[in-house]
Amino acid sequence: MEDYVYYNELYDLYGSLLTEKQRQYFEDYYFNNLSFSEMAEDYDISRNATFKQVHIVMEKLDELESKLELYKKRCELLKISSRIEDEEIKERLENLI
C-alpha cells in the first residue's frame, strides 16, 4: 500500500513529463485497477509486456524523483508546516505545497 501511495504522489508531480502511452499504462494499472492480463488484452500485447511497461514507468518516476527531489522537498515542507504555530504562515505554506 505504501508503494501505491508513493507512486501516486510521484505521478501527481511528474506525470506531465511522461509520454501519453506511459501515462495510459500507469493510469490503467494504478487508477483503473486493471490487472496485467486485462491490460494485455486491451493493448493486444503479452501480459509480460504490460508488466514490463508499468515497471518502466515506475523506474522513470523514480529517476525523475532522484534528479528533481520534488517529493522529498514536499515531505520536508509538510513536516515544517506541522510545527508552525502561526496559522496564517502555516496556511500560506500549505497553499504553496
Region annotations inferred by a language model:
Residues 53-56:
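Residues within the DNA-recognition helix of helix-turn-helix
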Residues 58-65:
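C-terminal flanking helix
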